Amino acid sequence: MNSTEPDSARVTRTDRLDPPEIADVLTLARAAGDADGADPFDEHTLLRLRDPHAPAHHLTVRAADGILAGYAHLDSTDPAAGTGVELAVHPTYRRQGIGRALARAVRATVTGPLRAWAHGDHPSAAALAVDLGYRRARVLWQLRRPLSAPIPQPPLPEGVTLRAFRPGTDDDAWLALNARAFADHPEQGRWTSADLRARRDEPWFDAAGFLLAVDPAGHLRGFHWTKVHERPGSPRIGEVYVLGVDPQAHGGGLGKALTAAGLAYLRDRRGLDRVMLYVDESNTAAVALYERLGFARWSAHVNYQRS
């Protein structure tokens, strides 16, 4: 373990966190998310944080009282795309130079391109990114919809039926379909069996809410994987976690039918009254589909890059 001291904050770098340190990061993330209305770390980062075998670099700043005041997670598993960065500062310790210190320590630690997510698109994050030479490269929108509003019931294409995902049986066929459906997606299309297994092991996993569209020959043609977010002190909310359609099945209304089926599941089987999803701003076809189904923009998540 070694330390650097940019600005007024002492930044410590390590390649491994012990369980109490991980708990401190999760506490910081919860405080930042409650203050900002958007969690600072995405699912990928949280999964890697809890995996003792996942390679990563961790930058931390502790206040004089020992509280974790700032944290940055560096993911170098995709060198072609650049090192992925997510960072957060505890609300109590903001406006003390900690965010800038972490960002500069990231730059001092990493050689090569950097890509950083700012969840919630807060003005302070945008200003810091621009000041440090990052450019706005990609935007994900979070859309939301009340489940109390009527849900359309579009028909499935002829011969197509829906059934639940079967863990251990459907894994390979689903991974192949996912790769086809997201061939141009920077993250989703590269999922491996380990990625699927990690999510199957999460407490929120619900095979009954992982809907598969199957043609008469038994081939998978599409899927709608739903998720329920449960957070103490906050109302539950459903998510269109991943929705995909085989390119050969495009244009037949399967995407709309799958979306509606998942929404009905979240409302009728899980008792939820609202749902959210994430969609790339550039995916105009998907945005249009979701808007027709009653979704509206809620927040933005911005990817910044620096060469």
Swiss-Prot record:
Residue ranges of every copy of the N-acetyltransferase domain listed in the record: 12-152, 160-307
Keywords from the named record: Acyltransferase, Repeat, Transferase
Pfam families attached to this UniProt entry: Acetyltransf_1
Annotated residues for binding of 1D-myo-inositol 2-(L-cysteinylamino)-2-deoxy-alpha-D-glucopyranoside: E43, E187, K227, E239, Y278
Record bears the keyword Repeat: yes
Gene3D superfamilies: 3.40.630.30
EC number(s) per entry: 2.3.1.189
EC class name: transferase
Gene Ontology process terms (BP): mycothiol biosynthetic process
Entry binding sites for acetyl-CoA 1: L87, A88, V89
InterPro entries for the chain: Acyl_CoA_acyltransferase (IPR016181), Bact_Acetyltransf (IPR050832), GNAT_dom (IPR000182), Mycothiol_AcTrfase (IPR017813)
Similarity-based family: Belongs to the acetyltransferase family. MshD subfamily.
Chain positions recorded as acetyl-CoA 2 binding sites: L243, G244, V245, H250, G251, G252, G253, L254, G255, K256
Catalytic function, reaction form: 1D-myo-inositol 2-(L-cysteinylamino)-2-deoxy-alpha-D-glucopyranoside + acetyl-CoA = mycothiol + CoA + H(+)
UniProt key word Glycosyltransferase: no
Function: Catalyzes the transfer of acetyl from acetyl-CoA to desacetylmycothiol (Cys-GlcN-Ins) to form mycothiol.
Protein name listed in UniProt: Mycothiol acetyltransferase
Record text on subunit structure and interactions: Monomer.
HAMAP family (UniProt xref): MshD
Any one Gene Ontology molecular-function term assigned to this protein's record: mycothiol synthase activity
